[in-house]
Swiss-Prot record:
It comes from the Bacteria. This is ATP-dependent helicase/deoxyribonuclease subunit B. Binds 1 [4Fe-4S] cluster. Residues 1-285 form the UvrD-like helicase ATP-binding domain.
Length: 1169
């Protein structure tokens, strides 16, 4: 038995000495006794590479690099100690999930916390800690019982927590018993098997890279001391600690304590002990400033280094993004200008996760190959999401969200279909399911999905060929999804035991060819050079299969409910991690200060050197709090270090990082976080500035304009990055600011490079004004043809904003349809219901004015019942909530029909047309226009209601439009082309009255009828008839009426003097109109309708001439942008030059009419000329 201690500060050559010694032994005797190099997990690949890259290693037949875990696996395989089933942390977490559910009633503390996310993982880590520190369930129980009666509340609380941990620990051990081995028991078994391991006898063991050992690891080392020929152990310490432990505040407290522990163990074993002290700093022979920093770190008082300090750079950055971009630029400069290889450079953070996403994004932008050390979670891999979402589909009764989470993993796509085509078809199915509210048995009842692009409440249209083709495609895609998931659901429903449930999931994965699809994805990633991604695809299937195997091995014959099975599977999947090794040798290594191990690093960037980050504040994420640990320590239980001890050890981790690079050390910190909150630099920055006052300083910025030309040149990283910065600089130049000549050189290069078309296209953004140019004539013709057929509302849309019209009617863009009841649906229902009631009355030869209240109830309910199944894919029949809405809509319709009946009783007008169509198959012809540019335009549509009345002067016609919100007619909106419907309908019916009704007619007015169920507020209680009277007033129709007393009295035959309760008109005692009456002369109606015609003609010409301007109006506080669906496309922004509203002025009706008359006269004169 022999042990040699190698002691020395960082950079003194301990690891190099071990490697050289191993290489020498291999050279002298390639087939001699085994050489085992024992290092931490993070260091195995690095040391294997260092040994393998030398020719003297002879292929490493004799020497092997192991971590403790890999050594255990190797020895147990040789000695037969691996005959029991090993359970990984993933399997333990699944087991603990089951145990927690079973033992929840026994908990004193964990009852509420046990259902929180991450709880199982914390418990598993605590169990692992008990194992590593050789704590048995009996010991935990003993401490808990003894402290349960303590007079101190804190101790009793801690004892209750320990009670719950003992329950879980005991139950876990009972489940494992003699058949299984906890992964943390590897080292205990290893210690037991070392005496019979031939590989250890005569072997030379080298131990390096460890800062401390757990009791389990010390048990293994003890057996190695007893049975190996020699052990050599290297520690980063400033002196030998063979006879004393270091002071608590000593920089080398952690490693010195470990040195002392191992030395005492070696003495107890009776080993021959020798020590070699490495005193010279070999790493920094040519960088005396870094050597001084290494030697003087944490020495008090500070002795400043007065010499030049070219190898230490402290960089300040405005943000984390600016910091990482600055690091990327410096890395490229080191490679291009200083001749370093990427493998010579490392980036280190205290917590890599804080920077991981930014590092990935920036380094990919800058084309810097990198490897991030650490085990990344598998939870975002598509296979993990497939399993989770498929179980959620079953749990949630085939809800849309779960189904399409499953679909978007792309594992349900057939192998023979290209991914792009499959994605497009899956997206179309998703849109269909959202629009039709597909869920539950609609997926599984065997019926086909039916597709109709347009659906009317009044008529049934034949399904078009395009709709038939779309329907077939949707059902084909459905067949990718439903059969495998439905089979999984049936198998899980019939499963009796865990074994059957796991088998159901496995068969599901096999049926959809997951292994083949993963292999295909792996090969595609390899071919594209995405090696890390390829490795992930290779590992994830094995990890899932291992998880299933462990589940079956441990609990295969037990019966579980589906919810608990899903919880356990979910827990297991959440714990899976990728074990990646660097896919390439020449790449930047990115790691954390505490876990990563590096060797022969020339340049190191320590990022995120901010207050609270370096040194790190101890996190209290464990089940056991700091107080709990202190209490356990007093009770004689040895566990992992307390927060106070970890805080003391932070200085050693910082020291290790500072002393790692041989050529150059970069420290950087951010001045603000992502939200703009200010951040302070770490005390380490101030300390280094005091110790090394002549250090180099740098500023990492996102805008290079403040830097010297040579510094700005670093921003020219590659074409992609350079283009971005060039555009930014040229924008400054356009704003009359000077820029460096560097950017003109870059610009000239970009304009002549092979990718110049891309650069030119992006450069065009410099002259972006957010103005839409008119369409070319050939494009306009392709979009619209020579003949436009449209609606009045389409023309109103164009007059509101030409670009919005272009987006909806030119590009035919549409909002995604959702399965929900919206205002247009309700409006459509009311229109159709009122038509249905009117048609029924005609069939039954009844009149509105003869209806009783009971009739209104009957007809309204019947109309809603008939139309509800046809509205928005049967949405009113889909749920109890919508059934309630249907009842509310019936109530409103009953109220409205009752009011219409009351109106009819006092009116001389009666309906002559309901939902009256013009154009197409309608009884009225379309409005047609011959445009100046040779195109033609016709307007088609439907009129809600046309009423007629016989007067002494002939036939009167009026238009009534049903509205779900209160509406009046603003002549300013008519003038600007924003409200054209009612006057168009009136013009149309009057123009074609003879062809339609066989007699010329006179316009009587245009009125809006508000469909609603008003709520009456009164200062005093009202009688029922008074309430009805107030409600009746709320239905007064607004609009414009003919300035004719006879016509007005025909609308309200009760009107003699005073104000009408039916229309917006009133009469004085002398029979003339009151001033607040909304009346116009027949000439004025004619002037308005002629203006509307001219407005249509002008709009048609502008559309066919290709006008697509982004020109929304603003009238008072109204703008079309408020409810526009295309804001993200036009990107209208008042802060951009030339993006201004067309401000329209609102004027009194008589002023508007006078203006229209004047313009009409000018138009007539122009036509005459």
């Amino acid at each position: 038995m022999e042990i040699q201690f190698l002691a020395g500060r960082s950079g003194s050559g301990k690891t190099t000495a071990i490697l050289e010694e191993i290489k020498e032994q291999l050279r002298l005797d390639p087939l001699g006794p085994p050489i085992i190099f024992l290092v931490p997990d993070q260091m195995t690949f690095l040391m294997e590479y260092e040994l393998a890259k030398t020719s003297e290693a002879g292929g490493m037949i004799r020497a092997k690099v192991f971590s403790f875990t890999r050594l255990a696996w190797s020895i147990l395989q040789q000695t037969g100690g691996a005959n029991r089933q090993f359970v990984t942390s993933t399997g333990i977490q699944m087991l603990l999930r089951k145990v927690i559910e079973e033992q929840k009633d026994k908990f004193k503390v964990f009852k509420k916390a046990s259902d929180k996310p991450g709880f199982v993982e914390q418990i598993e880590k605590t169990m692992a800690e008990f194992k590593r520190y050789c704590m048995l369930p009996e010991e935990i129980e003993k401490i808990s019982v003894e402290s349960m009666l303590s007079e101190y509340t804190e101790e009793r609380r801690a004892a209750e927590k320990l009670h719950d941990l003992h329950v879980l620990y005991q139950q876990m051990e009972e489940h494992l018993q003699d058949e299984y081995v906890h992964s943390e028991d590897y080292l205990n078994l290893l210690a037991q098997q070392i005496p019979s391991a031939e590989e250890i006898k005569g072997a030379h063991i080298y131990i390096d890279g460890f800062y401390q050992f757990t009791p389990q690891q010390l048990l293994v080392i003890e057996q190695l001391l007893l049975h190996a020929a020699k052990v050599t152990a290297a520690f980063t310490v400033d002196q030998s600690y063979h006879d004393r432990q270091p002071n608590e505040l000593d920089l080398f407290r952690m490693t010195g304590k470990t040195y002392f522990q191992l030395y005492q163990l070696a003495k107890e074993c009776g080993a021959d002990i020798s020590e070699t002290i490495f005193e010279r700093n070999h790493r920094h022979l040519y960088t005396p400033d870094l050597a001084y920093l290494e030697h003087q770190y944490e020495q008090r008082p500070v002795q400043p280094y007065q010499e030049n300090t070219p190898h230490l750079t402290v960089s300040k950055s405005a943000s984390k993004r600016a910091e990482i971009e600055g690091v990327a630029r410096d890395i490229l400069d080191l490679v291009r200008e200083k001749g370093l290889r990427l493998r010579d450079i490392s980036v280190v953070a205290r917590h890599v996760d804080d920077y991981k996403d930014t590092l990935k994004e920036v380094f990919r932008d800058y084309d810097i190959p990198f490897f991030i050390d650490g085990n990344e979670s598998m939870q975002y891999h598509p296979l993990i999401e497939l399993i989770r979402s498929s179980l959620d589909v079953i749990k949630g009764n085939w809800r849309y969200e779960a189904v399409f989470r499953c679909v978007k993993t792309e594992f349900l796509f057939p192998l023979e279909i290209t991914k792009n085509k499959a994605r497009e078809q899956a997206d179309q199915l998703e849109n269909y399911c959202i629009a039709y509210g597909v869920k539950g048995e609609r997926w599984t009842n065997g019926s086909r999905f039916h597709y109709r692009r347009f659906q009317s409440l009044d008529e049934d249209f034949r399904q078009t060929d395009q709709e038939i083709e779309m329907e077939q495609m949707l059902n084909d895609v459905k067949e990718w999804i439903t059969p495998p998931l439905y089979q999984l659901q049936k198998r899980l429903k019939n499963a009796q035991k865990v074994r059957d449930m796991v088998e159901a999931v496995y068969v599901f994965l096999e049926e959809i060819q997951v292994p083949d699809k993963l292999e295909k994805a792996r090969l595609e990633a390899e071919e594209a050079g995405r090696l890390a991604e390829a490795m992930q695809h290779g590992q994830v299937w094995d990890a899932v299969i291992q998880l299933m195997d462990e589940f079956v091995d441990m609990l295969g014959d037990e019966e579980l409910s589906f919810p608990l099975f899903q919880q356990m599977i979910d827990t297991g999947l959440a714990s899976l991690k990728f074990a990646l090794i660097p896919p390439s040798l020449d790449q930047v290594f990115i790691g954390s200060m505490d876990l990563s191990r590096m060797y022969q690093v020339k340049c190191m960037f320590i990022i995120g050197v901010n207050d609270g980050v370096i040194p790190a504040r101890p996190s209290d994420e464990s089940v056991l709090s700091e107080d709990d640990r202190e209490w356990l320590k007093r009770a004689g239980a040895e566990l992992a270090e307390t927060g106070k001890e970890r805080l003391l050890d932070e200085q050693f981790l910082i020291y290790q990082a500072l002393s790692s690079p041989s050529h150059h050390l970069y420290l950087s910190y951010a001045a603000s976080d992502a939200e703009g909150r200010s951040l302070l630099p770490s005390p380490l920055i101030k300390y280094c500035q005091e110790l090394m006052p002549n250090h180099q300083q740098a500023l990492y910025v996102l805008d290079p304009e403040l830097l010297e030309d040579d510094e700005q040149l670093k921003f020219v990283a590659n074409e992609h990055v350079s283009l971005s910065y060039t555009i930014s600089q040229l924008q400054q130049w356009l704003n009359q600011y000077p820029i460096s000549g560097v950017w003109w050189s870059v610009y000239n290069y970009l304009m002549t490079s092979p990718n110049r078309d891309v650069s030119k296209n992006i450069m065009s953004s410099l002259f972006f004004t957010n103005r839409a140019k008119p369409l070319k004539p050939n494009v306009t013709k392709e979009l619209y043809g020579d003949h436009i057929q449209g609606s009045v509302s389409r023309m109103e849309k164009f007059n509101a904003c030409a670009f919005s019209h272009f987006a909806s009617h030119g590009l035919k863009l549409k909002d995604r349809q959702f399965y929900k009841l919206e205002a247009p649906d309700i409006g459509q229902l009311f229109h159709s219901a009122l038509k249905h009631i009117s048609d029924t009355l005609v069939e039954q030869k009844k009149d509105w004015k003869n209806l009783t209240k009971e009739d209104c109830v009957t007809y309204s309910r019947h109309a809603i019942e008939q139309l509800a199944p046809r509205l928005q894919k049967e949405i009113l029949l889909s749920s109890n909530r919508h059934a309630y809405i249907k009842e509310k809509l019936q109530k409103i319709l009953i109220r409205v029909s009752s009011i219409l009946s009351e109106h009819a009783k006092v009116s001389g007008f009666s309906p002559v047309g309901l939902e009256l169509g013009f154009g197409g198959q309608g009884p009225l012809p379309p409005f047609t226009f011959q445009l100046k540019n040779g195109c033609t335009m016709e307007l088609v549509g439907r009129i809600d209601r046309v009423d007629k009345a016989e007067g002494s002067k002939g036939l009167f016609l009026r238009i009534v439009d049903y509205k779900s919100s209160e509406k009046g007619l603003d002549l300013a909106e008519v003038y600007y082309g924003l409200a054209l419907q009612m006057l168009t309908y009136l013009d149309l019916t009057i123009t074609y009255s003879k062809e339609w009704l066989g007699i010329e007619a006179t316009p009587a007015g245009i009125l809006y009828f508000h469909i609603h169920d008003p709520f009456i507020q009164a200062p005093i209680p009202l009688a029922e008839d008074e309430i009805e009277q107030e409600i009746f007033k709320k239905f007064k129709m607004k609009g414009l009426l003919l300035e004719d007393v006879e016509a007005v009295k025909l609308m309200d035959q009760t009107l003699e003097s005073g104000r009408s309760q039916v229309i917006q008109a009133g009469l004085k005692k002398d029979g003339s109109f009151r001033s607040d009456s909304a009346v116009l002369s027949e000439d004025h109606f004619h002037i308005l309708t002629q203006h509307v015609r001219r407005t249509f003609e002008e709009a048609g010409e502008r559309i066919t001439n290709g006008e697509v301007a982004i020109n929304p109006y603003k009238l008072k506080d109204q703008t079309p942008c408020r409810f526009c669906s295309f804001k993200s496309i036009c990107q209208f922004d008042e802060s951009i030059e030339d993006n201004d509203f067309r401000v329209l002025t609102s004027e009194k009706d008589d002023v508007v009419i006078e203006r229209i008359k004047k313009e009409g006269d000018q138009y007539a004169n122009t036509k005459t000329e």
